Amino acid sequence: MSQQAGNAQRGRFDEEPMSLGEKISHRMDQLKEIVSSSCPCAGKFPPVAIVLIVALIILGVIIAVPLVIFLSPSAQAMSSGTRDLSSHSIRHPKVWPKTEKVQDDDLSAIQMTSLLPPNVSTCSGFGFACTGSIDMIIPSSKRCDGLKDCSDGSDEENCKECQSIYSCRAHIEEESEKKDKTSVLPTLICLTAEKLCNGVENCPDGSDEASCRSKCSKDQFKCSGSDACLPISVKCDGVSDCENESDESNCNKCQKGAHKCGKNCIKASKVCDGIPDCDDGSDEHQCDCKTCSGSEKALCEDGTCIMRSQVCDGKHDCLDGIDEENCPGSCSNERFSSKLKLLTCDDGNQYSEVEACSGLVEACELNCPKCDPKHTFTCPAVGGIHNKCIKRSKVCDGIFDCEDGADEKKCTPVKECVVESSIQFTCDNKCLESSRRCDGVWDCEDKSDEKGCDKCPSRSFKCSADKKCLPFHTRCNGVAECSDGSDEHKCSCQECLGTHHDTYMCSESNRCLKRGEVCSPYSMCPNATYIDKAYCASLALKNSGLRP
């Protein structure tokens, strides 16, 4: 454009303001010139087309950005957190002694609350989260105690107050800090007694080696073989500060939060840690979330602190057994209201009395008040030993199971067995009366005495497809004895859980499975519910080490 034309153009602009349409047309021309400078081919298109293309590109970018964020791995991880499928707890480290429950904005958690009994808590939000291992949370009682409980030692960093016997500044105080009364609390190094007067300076100012004196003051004492003067207040606190543990002997009263257990004091960090140290377990009672905190702990409503692995493990660890109520694979009170009579057997597990006294659980042979008269043989008590319940297939098998050998007496030799007239029959190299056939009791180890049966007695189950009679307590045990699986169909809570200790009741399908076979790795329950699926997800996380 010539200078004269340009001046004329400017003069026209000065004289007549552009209309809205002219402004838009002018802007489109400018946009076309900008685009054409980068892409000469754009000059062939009208300005309107250029504007539409640019607008579509901008719109595509606006739509793509949130879509990329949504599909990213981190977004998927956050999305999966809407269903509580793990017990990871990520919390900003807090310095001792703050133990109040942290606010929601301090806590990002994926918890297994949907799988826990309603009256058992994991005390989420309490304790100290190790900086280098977000899935490891230690109780507040182990924070700044002079011992590194986190793998990265973060529990002993940024300490403002120590729970150990001795503390010193992490750095030497400057003169300006001494004069400044408004400065924050200094960071401390926490030391146990064994770090004092050991010839190694653990404090920057060497104060841990400067307190060694030949004579201590009235409120101090010395351990045998040590030059360190320790305060009397650390006696009987459950922590052995002396090598010979003399500071923990002859204790009539415990100090500094320690628990009296017989003649001993249990230190505060071992009280409410989920592991009973007293014979009566009293050190794990009357706990709260401040004391029973940590990634491996669980708190019962009655104040008992237990290990999280003890929840829903088939054993009653809370005082009233609430740690086993409404667990995945169990029946709610509405579906299964009968209270089972449980026996603790020699393997430490708890069994229903029906199962324990059926003769099928060897660990329970000496724990039954009364043996099942139909399915077992009762060995008489000898020398103060309780009656022993053995399964009937062990009778006359040539092996003495009873102390007095009663199970091998009155046995008919096989060569004298009358089998021609079907009065008797043989199996497992023993002779049995014909009345033992098809009676719903396994007298033969190979179970052949219960095959080929046209009828089965009451308190037994008939496999119609196989013509077999099964003992009543084998129904709904998670193992299909019938070829058509009919012995595992339409199971009730009483049949599944009232008779067996190692079974899992599927939430909605009336199907009973062996607990160890429920997940493979996904739930094997027909029409598996969220709880069934979450149980297997929890088990997978636990087996992979991602959850306690």
UniProtKB/Swiss-Prot annotation:
The chain crosses the membrane at residues 50-70. It is a single-pass type II membrane protein. Glycans are attached at residues 119, 244, 527. Its main location: membrane. Disruption phenotype: Severe sterility at the restrictive temperature of 25 degrees Celsius. Accumulation of unfertilized oocytes in the uterus, although this is controversial. Simultaneous RNAi-mediated knockdown with egg-1 results in a fragmented eggshell chitin layer which often accumulates at one end of the embryo. In unfertilized oocytes, disrupts the homogenous distribution of cortical chitin synthase chs-1, pseudophosphatase egg-3 and kinase mbk-2. In a egg-1 (tm1071) mutant background, causes polyspermy. SUPFAM superfamilies: LDL receptor-like module. It is found in: Cell membrane; Endosome membrane. Signal peptide: none annotated. Residues 122-160, 161-213, 215-252, 253-288, 291-328, 370-412, 416-454, 455-492 form the LDL-receptor class A domain. One of its GO terms (biological process) is single fertilization. GO terms for cellular component: endosome membrane; plasma membrane. It comes from the Eukaryota. SMART domains: LDLa. Gene3D superfamilies: Low-density Lipoprotein Receptor. Keywords: Cell membrane, Developmental protein, Disulfide bond, Endosome, Fertilization, Glycoprotein, Membrane, Receptor, Repeat, Signal-anchor, Transmembrane, Transmembrane helix. Residues 1-49 are cytoplasmic. Disulfide bonds join 130-150, 144-159, 162-190, 168-203, 197-212, 216-229, 223-242, 236-251, 254-265, 261-278, 272-287, 292-305, 300-318, 312-327, 371-389, 379-402, 396-411, 417-431, 427-444, 438-453, 456-469, 463-482, 476-491. One of its GO terms (molecular function) is signaling receptor activity. Probable receptor which is required for the oocyte-to-zygote transition although its exact function is controversial. Redundantly with egg-1, seems to be required for fertilization probably by promoting the interaction or fusion between sperm and oocyte. Conversely, shown to be dispensable for fertilization but required together with egg-1 for the formation of a continuous and cohesive eggshell chitin layer by maintaining a homogenous distribution of chitin synthase chs-1 at the unfertilized oocyte cell membrane. This is LDL receptor repeat-containing protein egg-2. It comes from Caenorhabditis elegans. The gene is egg-2.
